Amino acid sequence: MTTSLREDRSSSIGWLIAAGVAGGMLAARAALRARRLYDLRGKVVLITGGSRGLGLALARAFAHEGARIAVCARDAREIERARDDLASRGIEAFGTPCDLTERAGVERLVREVRARYGRIDVLVNNAGLIQVGPMETMTPADYEESLRIHFWAPLYTMLAVLPEMRRRRSGRIVNISSVGGKISMAHLLPYCSGKFALTGLSEGMRAALLQDNVVVTTVCPGLLRTGSPRNAFFKGRHRAEYSWFSISDSLPILSMGAARAARQIVTACKRGDAELVIPTMAKVWVTVNALFPGLMTDLLGSLERSLPQPGGIGSARERGARSGSALSPSPLTLLGDSAAVRHNEI
């Protein structure tokens, strides 16, 4: 046998072994998913930030699977509107106001949900806050606020429900991070800092809790059509910032509908997936960033130059709903504006 033939044969065997290993890994993954499949019928699901946006869409999606729903938010009026929305769909939900950045308030929330339903089977940490503007307009207080909401609040809720879940050796936790918790963006620096912290916390919690059969899923959404830009905060040239952000949030190529996203998140929770990145465009960004981090950083730096520069109201901030312009609302934001009505963002 010539050297060339021996090399060809060795190469073929190598490819066969690699294919066999890959096939075995896929089969093992499918078997593990099947073993972990979680029946949501009758389960109690607590959703933070559940009064509007993605949180409200998740409440509807979990209820569709037969779960019993509890939601919390800061604004009691928003909670009442959310309960009315769910009731109109035949869904009974418990709702209560809570400041998640206060640990005592979180513990009170968990006691109230247990008093109503007897237990908590699934925790969804969804509450969040978006701050948009150039780096120069952001203050230390903005970073502290983001960490309180995106890191400390989820930590408090997890610590409050974990003793019960670990005793039962059963439970699910879904942490809604962001593609901004994988790739940092210049005009979202406090937000991304908080979401990076949540991603790290969530991944570490999964590793720590698998032995107790408490399964943690980290969700990293990109742009979702929930209408949430109306309730985000904008700094600097706030009208221009709101325009680019709300238009991006409305474009079908870049964004995903909230109901579809919620269904995928519920499926990931049931299967016990480690991570879910949605939509497809966000998966592409995360993959490129993992393979070529320098390239992605340079691309984002180039994008920064096309975004609004410092000025306007400076480090003061204004809600998106008060930052309209000729570009937003407009036909370019039609999908996002319609979503805001459906998901209680108005």
What does each model-identified segment do?
Residues 44, 51-52:
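Conserved glycine-rich cofactor-binding loop
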Residues 65-81:
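Conserved glycine-rich Rossmann-like NAD(P)H-binding loop of the short-chain dehydrogenase/reductase
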Residues 76-77, 97-108, 140:
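The beta1-alpha1 cofactor-binding region of Rossmann-like NAD(H)/NADP(H)-dependent oxidoreductases
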Residues 134-135, 142-144:
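Substrate-binding pocket helix/loop in short-chain dehydrogenase/reductase
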Residues 158, 194:
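Active-site helix of classical SDR
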Residues 178:
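Residue(s) in the substrate-gating loop at a strand-loop-helix junction
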Residues 211-282, 287-291, 297-307:
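SDR active-site lid
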